[in-house]
């Protein structure tokens, strides 16, 4: 049926013509992505040692070495993306309901119809097993585990964190890590730099973001963000038999022990708890609700093209409905992280490398770790002591202490899905706030006391909205490290991947609006990006070549 302009809709364009326009716009967006991306090479680190490959839940021998035939079956699953083939991958422990279910190895075979294709973005290879950089990454995760119960505000004086800062700074590979906070003199300040990142605002003020400790209101219900956190001084998988059972996909011994007091997030164990119990995007929704309550989006419905006009307000575009839809849409970045995890890198989790390190130190394996880790006496003696204190008969192990019984999820480590998601969410929030408002000071900042029972006013330097959004993203990414299940490169590269994907998704959407508008905000690394409706974009005022954003490094004046 063909409709004329006399159709009942008050629309100067007949419905069939509008359908054609929508189709043409979608095709043009897809062509722009295809032509703007070009050929993207996906490169892993070339590692052939199975010790550095993901194989959790597969059968292992008594030394935790994966069965070669089972590993080949996993490779076949990944290559084919077929549910029936993946169902035939052997499991090491098949008692009862399989705990070690592989987490969505077929996800990357889906096709997205918005934003870039999964394979149209990439991340750098991870360091190889013998490298000083991997040694430093693993050492940082160990130090995070040792410091789980130190209040963040005591990082500058507590023995563990002061020692951790000095020890990490002295490792050859540490200054080369992604977004690592380190002084020009090569030292790490334990209070402002330890376990932080160089992203805008993350090194300023309290460790924990305001968006994780401020109350939020949803549907007129105000929620104080105290949680039932993990019990202090309790770690898991420090006994070798327990570790091996989990590597085989066996069931944990029981649930985690919990604290009997509700607390604000005041230390690494609390932050680990948040990132273990979250529903992957809830921190972003909480953050958005807090920012709305603070009029950080100027005020609800008055943003973007509606800021300087009086008779109209946004809702579906540049209003509450739009804000929360964009946060939900940013979840699509997760699929790109799954592509990188399964199809490209398949890197082992920290708990697996911790087992290999333990067996190497014990002389039962001969893994080629860098000496900066193998001979790190200060770190290893502390790991031995904390593990022996919890093990039967005070058995000394060098396994990585986990905050949870089950250890890592059953999918590869690199990049972190939580980080990719939160890189996307942070990008959406900063785009909606805008550059000017993003640089304003966050009002009445606070931090939890050392017991996590009350909030104390922070009297230091200005904490900006954009900085606290960035800090939220880094907190969530590094909270997964504090669980013991990720490395720094998982978090940082995941955040940057989520940012890149979301910039492109926002730009696609911007070009469809009837309202004249732009998005202008600061990227994690400090550059100001501005997106225009004609498809162009600038970095720090320089008009970038190309059709789509592929990273700051590809747009230099």
UniProtKB/Swiss-Prot annotation:
Q: Which cofactor does it need?
A: vanadate
* S-S bonds: 77-86, 441-462, 544-555
Which residues catalyse the reaction? 411, 418
Entry GO MF terms: bromide peroxidase activity; metal ion binding
Q: How is the cofactor bound?
A: Binds 1 vanadate ion per subunit.
Q: Provide the catalytic activity annotation.
A: RH + Br(-) + H2O2 = RBr + 2 H2O
Top-level taxon: Eukaryota
| Residues binding vanadate, per UniProt | 341, 349, 416-418, 480, 486
Pyrrolidone carboxylic acid PTM positions read 1
Location of the region described as Disordered in the Swiss-Prot/TrEMBL record = 1-22
Q: Which InterPro entries match?
A: Br/Cl_peroxidase_C, P_Acid_Pase_2/haloperoxi_sf, V-haloperoxidase
Q: Which UniProt keywords apply?
A: Disulfide bond, Metal-binding, Oxidoreductase, Peroxidase, Pyrrolidone carboxylic acid, Vanadium
Q: State the EC number(s).
A: 1.11.1.18
Member of which family? Belongs to the vanadium-dependent haloperoxidase family.
Q: How does it assemble?
A: Homodimer; disulfide-linked.
Role of this protein: Catalyzes the halogenation of organic substrates in the presence of hydrogen peroxide.
This protein is called what? Answer: Vanadium-dependent bromoperoxidase
């Amino acid at each position: 049926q063909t409709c004329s302009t006399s159709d009942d809709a008050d629309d100067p364009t007949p419905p069939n013509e509008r359908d054609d326009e929508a189709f043409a716009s979608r095709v043009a967006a897809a062509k722009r992505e295809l032509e703007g991306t070009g050929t993207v090479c996906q490169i892993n680190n070339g590692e052939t040692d199975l010790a550095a490959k993901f194989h959790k839940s597969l059968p292992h021998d008594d030394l935790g070495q994966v069965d070669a035939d089972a590993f080949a079956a996993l490779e076949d699953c990944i290559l084919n993306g077929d549910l029936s083939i993946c169902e035939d991958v052997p499991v090491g422990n098949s008692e009862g309901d399989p705990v070690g279910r592989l987490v969505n190895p077929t996800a990357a075979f889906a096709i997205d119809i918005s934003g870039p294709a999964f394979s149209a973005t990439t991340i750098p290879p991870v360091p190889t097993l013998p490298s000083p950089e991997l040694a430093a990454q693993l050492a940082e995760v160990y130090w995070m585990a040792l410091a789980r119960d130190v209040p963040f505000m005591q990082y500058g004086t507590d023995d563990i964190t002061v020692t951790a800062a000095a020890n990490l700074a002295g490792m050859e590979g540490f200054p080369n890590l992604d977004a690592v906070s380190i002084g020009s003199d090569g030292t790490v300040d334990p209070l402002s730099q330890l376990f932080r990142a160089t992203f805008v605002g993350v090194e300023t003020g309290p460790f924990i973001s305001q968006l994780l400790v401020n109350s939020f209101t949803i549907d007129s219900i105000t929620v104080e963000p105290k949680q039932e956190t993990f019990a202090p001084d309790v770690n898991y998988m420090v006994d070798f038999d327990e570790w091996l059972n989990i590597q085989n996909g066996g069931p944990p011994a029981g649930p985690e022990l919990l604290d009997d007091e509700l607390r604000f997030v005041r230390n690494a164990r609390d932050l680990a708890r948040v990132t273990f119990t979250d529903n992957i995007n809830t921190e972003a929704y909480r953050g958005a609700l807090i920012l709305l309550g603070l009029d950080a989006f100027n005020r609800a419905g008055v943003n973007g093209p509606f800021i300087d006009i009086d008779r109209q307000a946004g809702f579906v575009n540049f209003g509450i409905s739009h804000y929360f839809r964009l946060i939900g849409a940013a979840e699509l970045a997760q699929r790109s992280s799954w592509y990188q995890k399964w199809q490209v890198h398949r890197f082992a989790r920290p708990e697996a490398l911790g087992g290999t390190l333990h067996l190497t130190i014990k002389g039962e394996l001969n893994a080629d770790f860098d000496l900066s880790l193998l001979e790190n006496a200060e770190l290893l003696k502390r790991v031995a002591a904390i593990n022996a204190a919890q093990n039967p008969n005070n058995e000394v192990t060098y396994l990585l202490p986990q905050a949870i019984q089950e250890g890592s999820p059953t999918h590869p480590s690199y990049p972190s899905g939580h980080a990719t998601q939160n890189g996307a969410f942070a990008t959406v929030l900063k785009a909606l706030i805008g550059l000017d408002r993003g640089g304003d000071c966050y009002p009445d900042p606070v931090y939890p006391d050392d017991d996590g029972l009350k909030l104390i006013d922070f009297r230091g330097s200005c904490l900006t909205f954009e900085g606290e959004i960035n800090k939220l993203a880094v907190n969530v990414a590094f909270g997964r490290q504090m669980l013991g299940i990720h490395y720094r490169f998982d978090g940082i590269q995941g955040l940057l991947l989520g940012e890149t994907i979301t910039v492109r998704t926002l730009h696609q959407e911007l070009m469809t609006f009837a309202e004249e508008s732009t998005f202008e905000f600061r990227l994690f690394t400090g550059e100001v990006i501005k997106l225009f409706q004609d498809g162009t974009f600038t970095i720090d005022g320089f008009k970038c070549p190309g059709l789509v954003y592929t990273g700051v490094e590809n747009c230099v004046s």
